[in-house]
Amino acid sequence: MASKLLRAVILGPPGSGKGTVCQRIAQNFGLQHLSSGHFLRENIKASTEVGEMAKQYIEKSLLVPDHVITRLMMSELENRRGQHWLLDGFPRTLGQAEALDKICEVDLVISLNIPFETLKDRLSRRWIHPPSGRVYNLDFNPPHVHGIDDVTGEPLVQQEDDKPEAVAARLRQYKDVAKPVIELYKSRGVLHQFSGTETNKIWPYVYTLFSNKITPIQSKEAY
């Protein structure tokens, strides 16, 4: 098994189960799960310069532009030069992918392809705890108490863009922006696409893929 550092990326539309898959990869293989959403929340909370820049867009329900999110993620990656990692939420655009190219070579890219109806159903059942970014699904990951965050006891909310009428627009936007990123990694031979309606059925194939690249840190596959 090669000892070089593994640099991986996960791509997928809202509701595709990226967060769950990332948690399992981190748990089974020891990769650092680097979520752009998590870093954005941390920087906004700490009122950093990049956090204040991002906040202006988020408050207007606009996408954070490439130059802001790229600056944020480059800083985080510089601090993790000696680690195996898995990027979640970055790169979202071709510009972000090209910026990532300048500091490292991506070894492995996972793209999750989930049917539209499944995504729509999942998102309509999704509730979040905004301060932490914790996500719950009423079907397969419900909170212990309905409408309440397990950790803080604070109320959960449903995002406006998770409501059915907004989902179709979000998915169209994702496809338009993600297509050139997917094509880029496909042309390099590092893209692996997984299709299905259930994360538990996709996961064994993801586990096998990573097992061929890096030694699992657990003797038994963890879910």
Curated annotation (Swiss-Prot):
Induction line: By hypoxia (at protein level).
Annotated tissue distribution: Highly expressed in kidney, moderately expressed in heart and liver and weakly expressed in brain.
Modified residues (N6-acetyllysine): K175, K179, K186
Span list, region NMP: 35-64
Source species, domain of life: Eukaryota
Broad enzyme group: transferase
Residues where N6-succinyllysine is found: K60, K179, K186
Protein name: Adenylate kinase 4, mitochondrial
Source species of the chain: Homo sapiens
